[in-house]
Amino acid sequence: MYMRDTIAAISTPPGNGGIGIIRISGGSASCIAETLFRPVRSGGLISHRFYYGTLIDIQTGAVVDEVMAVIMRAPHSYTREDVLELHCHGGMLVVERILSLVLRAGARLAEPGEFTRRAFLNGRIDLVQAESVMDIISAQTDAALALAQRQRGGVLSSRIAEARQLLLHALALIEAYIDFPEDDLGETDVESIRSSVEGARTHIRRLLEDFNEGRLLREGISVLIIGKPNAGKSSLLNRLLNENRAIVTHLPGTTRDIIEETINLGGLAVRLLDTAGIRHTEDVIEQEGINRALEKIPQADLILFVLDGSRPFGPEDRLILDALQGNRFVAAISKADLPRVLELPSECCNLPQVSFSAESGEGVDDLKSTVRSLFVSSQAIDNREYVAISRVRHRDALSSADGSLSRFRQGLDSGASLDLLALDLREALASVGEVTGQVTNEDVLDLIFSSFCIGK
């Protein structure tokens, strides 16, 4: 990957559409515009202004398409390089033909995420903000989008910068005494160092505490719906989806394969998996569906154990309950519109329990609230100022920083040498810097930006 190259890519999704966009970034962007674009009005292209005209194949002189062109000159662009965008009709044939002409005019095809990578390397955004671009694109709920937008706006980066400044202050005091060994570390400076480090550690630990919520908002959760035949699993799925996605009959064993659908559960993306009814059967195909359902149990974030409230707790329910031990699950008691017959065994007393009727909708909202509350707080969903780390990379780096600060505190209390204390602080600073990209390496950047789409 060469930063001096001019890169180009299609920035709109594949397939036919109303508009297609080809994005070009680099030193040759203006030259490519002059070569291929013929504006209706003569004169040079002013930065950040759209121009209507035609796109020409310079080898044949033929008009390829009518386009709108905009040049955004460095450093006032997404990449802080000259950026040219060509907006054409959205047919794939014309979009790909224009891209081929741009490549022939001197650009090369961009790699996945290369535009955003250049924005990072050129100092326009930090690494957290770069990652948030992909999170904005892939967000499935308003809460996930709001979190990504706050990260993109620099709120998380500011929190991390505050911790970093406190650590730099402490390190500066220690290094001053290292440079002038004839002076002893005074009590006032010791307390100032301790206060700065503890302040930084508080910032870091608060972010670590919110990691699971941040990750779940970004990634969502998987919820497995499991139960014996005719317990009401597929009816519950249909009610949650507000559509007849699964076939529902009075015949047991109707659902044989796993049905997957995603819903927005009050700000939390939930992947629902409806499964075959669990029972002993001689039907080979049905048994395969049962085996697949049982295999999904340890992979799910939560299991909704659907029990028929109008029938006694039976051997099939016991079989499922035994299979669920050690996993997180909710007892979802169906058919609340019928007289209650079910009595749960004693080991279910401390479980979350919700009665519902898929027929009338009674209790379904309570079930949704129960599921959501097990994973995220109302603050994470509703507070527009909420910010959290949301990636394992963030957590690992901050956990490493917290470990370094723990060693620092122990060393400070036990009278360790200033050199060792400074080493712990430098390690903590390096770990904190990994989050925003102040300290990084090419392998990490390759891993992050390879997940982006081409053209972003």
Curated annotation (Swiss-Prot):
It comes from the Bacteria. Binds 1 potassium ion per subunit. NCBIfam families: mnmE_trmE_thdF, PRK05291.1-3, small_GTP. It is an enzyme of class 3 (hydrolase). (6S)-5-formyl-5,6,7,8-tetrahydrofolate binds at R23, E85, R124, K456. This is tRNA modification GTPase MnmE. InterPro entries: G_TrmE (IPR031168), GTP-bd (IPR006073), GTP-bd_TrmE_N (IPR018948), GTPase_MnmE (IPR004520), MnmE_dom2 (IPR027368), MnmE_helical (IPR025867), P-loop_NTPase (IPR027417), Small_GTP-bd (IPR005225). GO terms for molecular function: GTP binding; GTPase activity; metal ion binding. It comes from Pelobacter propionicus (strain DSM 2379 / NBRC 103807 / OttBd1). K(+) binds at N230, T249, L251, T254. Disulfide bonds: none annotated.
